[in-house]
């Protein structure tokens, strides 16, 4: 009888671990992160992501990633509500800190928004930066988590 209980408990623990590990993949979804960080409402058909760089390896949730976004008209209109180029000093410093790993393409006319997901710290630890290029209609999502 004790053996049956032990097996049941072990089975429940294993099932729980499987459910948690499957659910955590949801957090690795860059489209969901884009929507959450920037308060955007995007239909599945209105946003296609292309991964340009990603070094999220080893420890979960630590790394840098750059995605190119092809978005619909509704999302582009939302981008027009953001800060217009040039970047602020804070955004320039953030991009400079990542320049050894990844760089955005040259953009002359566009809009941008930076979200510090760990406010109150003096260092950049969890930051998302999205940049919209008006000339090409493309957007770029740059995320960093350390």
What are these regions (language model features)?
Residues 1-20:
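Sec-dependent bacterial lipoprotein signal peptides
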Residues 3-5, 31, 91:
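Short amphipathic alpha-helical segments that mediate assembly, nucleic-acid/protein binding
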Residues 6, 72-74, 135, 146:
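Generic structural motif
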Residues 7, 26, 87-90:
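Non-membrane alpha-helical secondary structure
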Residues 19, 56-57, 120, 126:
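Intrinsically disordered, low-complexity segments
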Residues 22-81:
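N-terminal export/targeting and maturation segments
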Residues 79-89:
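Extended Gly/Ser/Thr-rich low-complexity repeat segments
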Residues 88-146:
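Extracytoplasmic electrostatic interaction patches
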């Amino acid at each position: 009888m004790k053996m049956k209980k032990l097996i049941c408990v072990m089975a429940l623990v294993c099932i729980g671990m499987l459910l948690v590990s499957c659910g955590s993949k949801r957090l690795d979804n860059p489209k969901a992160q884009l929507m959450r960080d920037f308060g955007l409402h995007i239909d599945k058909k209105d946003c296609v992501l292309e991964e340009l760089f990603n070094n999220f390896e080893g420890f979960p949730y630590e790394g840098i990633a750059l995605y190119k976004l092809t978005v619909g008209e509704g999302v582009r209109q939302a981008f027009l509500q953001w800060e217009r180029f040039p970047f602020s000093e804070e955004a320039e410093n953030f991009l400079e800190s990542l320049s050894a790993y990844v760089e955005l393409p040259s953009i002359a006319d566009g809009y941008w928004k930076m979200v510090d997901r760990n406010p109150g710290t003096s260092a950049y630890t969890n930051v998302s930066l999205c940049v919209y290029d008006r000339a090409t209609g493309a957007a770029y999502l740059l995320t960093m988590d350390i």
